[in-house]
A protein has these predicted regions:
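Flexible loop linkers connecting adjacent transmembrane helices
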Residues: 38-67, 91-98, 113-146, 330-346, ...
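Helix-loop-helix module between adjacent transmembrane segments
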Residues: 30-32, 107-132, 138-201, 357-367
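Alpha-helical membrane segments and immediately flanking helix-loop junctions
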Residues: 58-93, 121-139, 143, 157, ...
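N-terminal alpha-helical transmembrane segments of multi-pass membrane transport
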Residues: 1-79, 83, 94-100, 232, ...
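Transmembrane helix-loop junctions in multi-pass membrane proteins
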Residues: 3-4, 34-39, 84-89, 164-175, ...
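Extracellular/periplasmic helix-exit of transmembrane alpha-helices
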Residues: 116-126, 228-244, 252, 256-259, ...
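Select transmembrane alpha-helical segments in multipass membrane proteins
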Residues: 21-27, 67-76, 147-161, 191-192, ...
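Membrane-interface loop-to-helix entry segments
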Residues: 23-30, 34-47, 172-178, 185-246, ...
Length: 454
C-alpha cells in the first residue's frame, strides 16, 4: 500500500505542478477580461437575479428544459458544498499554511468567470435522448463545439472516474468524523451511506432536485451562523488571522518543512486545488445540472456560476479557514477532518456537534450531486441500458471510502480531478469567443438586463 501511495503521490505532484495551476489561473483571467469583469461589474445584478428572482420562481418549470434555474443551482451547490468546504480547507491550511487561503480566494475570484463560461457553453450545446429529454454536460460542447466526438467520450469516462474519487472523499470524511467523535465503526457508516444514497438513486433528477432545494439553503445558512458565532467569540484574533493569510501567501518562512519559493508554491498549490475541489470551477461538473435548466438566454443561467463560487468559497470556505485560524487549532497534529470539527468545539462544546451535523449534511448532499454527474457521464460513454444496470454500483463505493486512509483518498481525488480538467480546459480555451459573444448579447439586450438594473 505504501508503494502504491508513493506512486500516486508522484503522479499527483506532476499533474498538479505549476503548469496546471498557471493554466487554470490564466484561463480564469482570460474569461474575466474578455467578459468585462462580469463578477465585479454585474455582481449586484447577478445576486438579485440568481438568488432573489430565481427563488421566487423556483417552481416555475415552463420552457425548454427539465428543472428551474434555482433547482439547478441547488443541485450544483449540493455537489459543491461538501467535505471540501470543511475538511478540504483544513487540509489546505495544514499543508500550505494560512497563506493557502489567499490563493483559494484568488482561484475563486477568477473561477467565477470560468464557471460562468462553462455554464453558458452547456446551454449552447445540449443533446436529447430518445424521449426528447434534454442532455447536458461538458461532453456535448466538446463533441459539438470542438467537433471532437472521441474527446467527448474521453471526458465522460474521466468524469466517471473523478466522481468515484469524489465519492471516496465524502464517504471518508463522514466515517472519519463519526469514528473520531462518536466511535461509530467505519464499516457501519459505509453501510448506512449505501442505504441512504440508494434511496436517492432510485428517485432520479426530480427527487435529487427537490431534496437539494430543501436541504442546501438550510444547511448552508446553519453552518454560516455557527461559524460566525465562533468568529465573533474570538473577534480579537481575526485581524491577526487575516494578516497571516496575506503574509504567509508570499512568505519565505518555512511551512510544513519547506523553504523559500517552495513554501509559496505549496501554499498556491493547496489553496488552488482545494478551492477548486470545493467550487468545481473549470472541472466541467456544473454543465450537468445547469444545461438542463429552463432559461431564455444562456447567460441567464451562466451567471449562477458566479453566485455558486461566491457562496461556496468566498463565504463558506472562508468561514472554515477563519474559524480554524482564530482557534489556533491548525497548529496541532490533528487530522484535517478532526481539526475542522474540533475548532468549533474549542469555543463551546455543543458547537462541535452542530458543526458535525452540518458537515454530515454537506457530504451527503455532495454524494447525491456526484451520483447525478456520474450517471450522466456513464450514459454518454456506454449508453442508457448499461447505466440502468450499473447505476446502483456508485453507492457501494461508500464502503471503500469509509475504510480507506484519508491521505490516499485525497491523492486519488486530486489525480482524477486533474485528468478531467485537461480536456475541459482545451474546450474552454477554444470556445471562449462564443461565451464572449453571448455575454455581449445578454448585457446589451434590454429584454434581459436593462429592466433589472432599476
Amino acid at each position: 500500500m505504501e508503494s502504491l501511495e508513493l506512486f500516486l503521490t508522484t503522479i499527483n505532484k506532476w499533474l498538479w505542478g505549476r503548469w496546471l495551476v498557471y493554466v487554470l489561473l490564466g484561463l480564469g483571467i482570460l474569461y474575466t477580461f474578455t467578459n468585462g469583469f462580469i463578477q465585479v461589474r454585474h455582481f449586484k445584478f447577478i445576486v438579485k437575479k440568481t438568488l432573489v428572482d430565481s427563488f421566487k420562481a423556483r417552481n416555475d418549470e415552463k420552457g425548454s428544459g427539465s428543472i428551474s434555474t434555482f433547482k439547478a443551482m441547488m443541485v450544483t451547490l449540493a455537489g459543491n458544498v461538501g467535505g471540501g468546504n470543511v475538511v478540504g480547507v483544513a487540509t489546505a491550511v495544514a499543508a500550505g499554511g494560512m497563506g493557502a487561503v489567499f490563493w483559494m480566494w484568488v482561484a475563486a475570484f477568477f473561477g467565477m468567470a470560468l464557471k460562468y463560461g462553462e455554464i453558458v457553453l452547456s446551454q449552447l450545446y445540449r443533446g436529447k435522448d430518445s424521449e426528447g429529454n434534454l442532455l447536458s454536460g461538458p461532453m456535448y460542447y466538446i463533441r459539438d463545439g470542438l467537433k471532437a466526438p472521441w474527446l467527448g467520450v474521453v471526458i465522460a469516462v474521466l468524469m466517471c472516474t473523478k466522481m468515484m474519487g469524489a465519492n471516496l472523499v465524502q464517504s471518508n470524511t463522514i466515517s472519519g468524523v463519526l469514528s473520531s467523535n462518536y466511535n461509530v465503526p467505519t464499516w457501519l457508516t459505509g453501510v448506512i451511506l449505501i442505504c441512504c444514497l440508494m434511496a436517492v438513486v432510485m428517485g432520479g433528477l426530480k427527487r435529487l432536485a427537490n431534496i437539494a432545494t430543501s436541504l442546501v439553503p438550510i444547511m448552508s445558512i446553519f453552518y454560516v451562523v455557527v461559524g460566525l458565532l465562533v468568529i465573533l467569540l474570538n473577534i480579537q484574533q481575526v485581524p491577526e488571522v487575516i494578516k497571516e493569510i496575506f503574509t504567509q501567501a508570499f512568505s519565505m518562512k518555512a511551512v510544513a518543512g519547506g523553504t523559500g519559493g517552495y513554501v509559496i508554491a505549496r501554499a498556491m498549490q493547496y489553496g488552488i486545488t482545494r478551492g477548486m475541489y470545493s467550487n468545481e470551477a473549470g472541472e466541467g461538473t456544473a454543465p450537468f445540472a445547469h444545461g438542463s435548466a429552463i432559461v431564455d438566454h444562456p447567460c441567464e443561467e451562466g451567471i449562477t456560476g458566479v453566485t455558486e463560487v461566491f457562496l461556496d468559497t468566498i463565504i463558506i470556505c472562508s468561514i472554515t479557514a477563519i474559524v480554524i485560524g482564530v482557534t489556533g487549532i491548525y497548529q496541532s497534529d490533528l487530522s484535517p477532518a478532526v481539526m475542522a470539527i474540533e475548532s468549533f468545539g474549542t469555543v463551546w462544546a455543543p458547537l462541535k456537534h452542530l458543526a458535525t451535523f452540518a458537515l454530515l449534511l454537506f457530504c451527503f448532499t455532495t454524494l447525491m450531486g456526484q451520483w447525478f454527474n456520474a450517471a450522466k457521464s456513464f450514459t454518454y460513454a456506454f449508453g442508457p441500458k448499461v447505466t440502468d444496470k450499473v447505476r446502483f454500483v456508485f453507492p457501494f463505493l461508500c464502503i471503500i471510502g469509509a475504510l480507506t486512509k484519508i491521505s490516499l483518498v485525497w491523492t486519488i481525488q486530486d489525480i482524477a480531478m486533474g485528468l478531467v480538467i485537461i480536456p475541459n480546459l482545451i474546450a474552454l480555451i477554444i470556445l471562449f469567443p462564443q461565451v464572449r459573444q453571448q455575454t455581449k448579447d445578454y448585457f446589451s439586450n434590454p429584454k434581459f438586463y436593462a429592466q433589472d438594473k432599476k
